[in-house]
């Protein structure tokens, strides 16, 4: 599957993004403030889009597809709906529940067919979960050292209120669809809408 392979910390610096939003504890040695000429309105809008794509690990075509889907929804604002759709990706939900140290690792776990949604194997990272969905690691995979190592890192993280995770049994439930104030990504979605509306 194609994805952005640029060095993570370098990309974070370019976007003014703290690595912790990606699940990475490493700190950049450089200051996040970037000197130079003032960014244009278009440049600011473009950077917000790039930031959202980078956080969720989504390339342009699927990102645009999510935007078009968000635009057609009959409720909420397009920008908020876009972020909600990105949050409801299976790879992101796995990351949020603590079953991946990063979204990239969570995506690999889904790709490798370790994940069940309502008892059925799903290996599509972009799969959209729904309220009430029960997500679990396959029984034969639960004893793998990989998950012990992951939980050593993620067990102390706060699971969002719209999700429930049972780390002992490697399961979780989507309690509800998240609202914008439950999504902690530092993205101004209004600027993304303005960019695509040009």
From Swiss-Prot:
InterPro entries in the cross-refs:
Ribosomal_uS4 (IPR022801), Ribosomal_uS4_bac-type (IPR005709), Ribosomal_uS4_CS (IPR018079), Ribosomal_uS4_N (IPR001912), S4_RNA-bd (IPR002942), S4_RNA-bd_sf (IPR036986)
Q: Self-association or partners: how does it assemble? A: Part of the 30S ribosomal subunit. Contacts protein S5. The interaction surface between S4 and S5 is involved in control of translational fidelity.
GO molecular function annotation: rRNA binding; structural constituent of ribosome
Q: Name one GO biological process term.
A: ribosomal small subunit biogenesis
Sorted alphabetically, the Gene Ontology cellular component annotations on this record are:
small ribosomal subunit
Q: Which HAMAP family match?
A: Ribosomal_uS4_B (MF_01306_B)
The entry assigns this protein to a family as follows: Belongs to the universal ribosomal protein uS4 family.
Spell out the SMART domains in the cross-references.
Ribosomal_S4 (SM01390), S4 (SM00363)
Checking Pfam families in the record gives: Ribosomal_S4, S4
Task: Sum up the protein's function in the record's words.
Answer: One of the primary rRNA binding proteins, it binds directly to 16S rRNA where it nucleates assembly of the body of the 30S subunit. With S5 and S12 plays an important role in translational accuracy.
Record-linked NCBIfam families = PRK05327.1 (NF003717), rpsD_bact (TIGR01017)
Instruction: Name its species.
Output: Lachnoclostridium phytofermentans (strain ATCC 700394 / DSM 18823 / ISDg) (Clostridium phytofermentans)
State the protein's name: Small ribosomal subunit protein uS4
Question: Which keywords describe this protein according to UniProt?
Answer: Ribonucleoprotein, Ribosomal protein, RNA-binding, rRNA-binding
Q: Which gene encodes it?
A: rpsD
Q: Does the keyword Ribonucleoprotein apply?
A: yes
């Amino acid at each position: 599957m194609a994805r952005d392979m640029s060095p993570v910390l370098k990309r974070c610096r370019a976007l003014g993004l703290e690595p912790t939003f990606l699940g990475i504890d490493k700190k950049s040695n450089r200051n996040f403030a970037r000197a130079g000429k003032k960014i244009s309105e278009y440049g600011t809008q473009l950077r917000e889009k790039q930031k959202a794509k980078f956080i969720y690990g989504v390339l342009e075509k699927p990102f645009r597809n999510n935007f078009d889907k968000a635009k057609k929804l009959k409720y909420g604002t397009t920008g908020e709906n876009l972020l909600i759709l990105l949050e409801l990706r299976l790879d992101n939900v796995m990351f949020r529940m603590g079953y991946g140290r990063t979204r990239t690792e969570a995506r690999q776990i889904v790709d490798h067919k370790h994940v069940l949604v309502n008892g059925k194997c799903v290996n599509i990272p972009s799969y959209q979960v729904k309220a009430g969905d029960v997500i679990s690691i396959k029984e034969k995979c639960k004893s793998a050292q990989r998950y012990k190592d992951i939980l050593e890192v993620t067990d102390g993280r706060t699971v969002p209120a719209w999700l429930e995770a049972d780390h002992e049994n490697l399961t979780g439930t989507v309690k509800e669809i998240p609202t914008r104030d439950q999504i902690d990504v530092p993205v101004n979605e209004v600027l993304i809408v303005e960019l695509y509306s040009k």
